[in-house]
Amino acid sequence: TGGNPRFVPIVCTSGQHRALLDQALTVFSIVPDHDLGVMVPGQSLFYVTRTALARFEPVLRQEQPDLVIVQGDAQTAFVGALAAYYSRIPVVHVEAGLRTGDPYAPFPEEMNRRLIDRIAALLFAPTAAARRNLLAEGISDESIVVTGNTEIDALLYVRKSVPPRIRFDLPGRIVLVTAHRRESFSGGIARICRGLRRLAERNREITIVYSVHPNPHVSRVVRDELSGAERVTLIDPPDYASFVHLMADSALILTDSGGIQAVSYTHLRAHETPEQLVCRLLLEKK
């Protein structure tokens, strides 16, 4: 809020992916006012939805906010918007209007963001293309503000102002990999890993660095397929600042992440590196 006394932010986190969340909050000196503590091993979409909805309701009753701001397309973002709607509190959606056109790709994020955009009273679209998507769906132009991408804002701030906690001293050209999307669980992650193994075997000048998501549906497969592979280094997800600098040091980024897709382009423009390959069948129209 920049210290504006008209606004009093109340931060509520879902608690999903605890280690990843805590390190990101630390970088930006954010201390949540409420933590829903949703995460449990092997959680399903049904569990996340009902648990987050039940735990967010008393927060809304206690705080009685004038607005609820949700960002992105995660299941908890949708639940936050739905809980606010049930409480008759206006919703603001950050990253509104991103679309692939297929309700099952990415799953469940594509449907989550469509539903959030129907609930929201004010929609912060990251691009003019996202605004056009919203207009095409019949959403009023007066409800849409093109704001730019907050992930890119965060990356630029960290790259300039926050040194990495970890520096990766690796030989050759770095190929950085992340892959974790739910639609890749049924064989997709394994196929990506086998492709990476072949890539490393055929290109002796590279080192593949795979930042392995903690979800067991991902980590178990990746470690089974790639542990011990030549010129492949598996790492736990580093802190946010270290990852930003690792991206900048990479010659190629292979990812299925929409967020990394967006910020990789910023690195590309700033450094003429890295290139990126997006491991998904459909992309958001950004």
Where are these regions (language model features)?
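Conserved small/polar residues in nucleotide/adenosyl-binding loops
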Residues: 266-273, 277, 285-286
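A nucleotide-sugar donor-handling region in carbohydrate enzymes
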Residues: 12-19, 119-187
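A short, histidine- and acid-enriched strand-loop-helix "catalytic/donor-clamping" loop
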Residues: 92-107, 121
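Membrane-proximal helix-turn-helix segments that form the acceptor-binding/catalytic region
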Residues: 109-122
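Donor-nucleotide binding loops and adjacent catalytic segments primarily
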Residues: 22-24, 43, 161-249
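An aromatic- and histidine-rich active-site surface loop
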Residues: 69-87, 264
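A donor-sugar binding/catalytic signature common to diverse glycosyltransferases
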Residues: 70-71, 93-94, 123, 243-269
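Conserved nucleotide-sugar phosphate-binding/catalytic loop shared by glycosyltransferases and other
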Residues: 5-55
